[in-house]
Regions:
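Nucleotidyltransferase catalytic core that binds NTPs
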Residues: 1-144
Length: 144
């Protein structure tokens, strides 16, 4: 079973690793789509590291079989499906994507056989990049 996971993966942390470990457990091949820099800028924030470096970091993680950079924001994420050819799309616990709307779009595009599942989060206060940055800033302020 081929699994596809998608994310920004800016400043890798334990939450990312947990997401990818759980995603890999769903099948035997994990392809990770690392968000294109322009997509990150449009949907979230200015990335700290560029997509090529984030891809390289993700490729080095044990659960990952393959990592690719995703489409620019003017191209639908669904257009990457023929490249990845997943049986399962694994969503992170904190990703805003609605499973039902993804399933509906998959059906419309003729990919109704692809399963969509959401993996569990890591039970840690510092499981997200923004949380880690906030904690570092807090520690820095308290140091003074």
């Amino acid at each position: 079973m081929r699994v596809m996971a998608v994310g920004v993966f800016d400043l890798l942390h334990a939450g990312h690793l947990h997401y990818l470990e759980q995603s890999k457990a769903l099948g035997n091949h994990l392809t990770v789509v690392v968000a294109h820099d322009d997509t990150v800028r449009v949907r979230k924030h200015e990335p700290v590291t560029n997509h090529d470096l984030r891809k390289r970091m993700v490729e080095g993680l044990k659960p990952v079989d393959e990592a690719i950079v995703g489409n620019s924001p003017d191209v639908s994420i669904f257009e990457i499906l023929p490249v990845v050819n997943p049986d399962i799309i694994a969503l992170g616990y904190d990703q805003e994507h609605a499973e039902d709307s993804i399933r509906q779009k998959l059906n419309e595009l003729g990919y109704g056989e692809i399963k969509v599942t959401r993996v569990e989060g890591l039970s840690d206060d510092l499981d997200g990049t923004r949380k880690i940055i906030a904690r570092v800033l807090e520690l820095s302020r308290n140091k003074d």
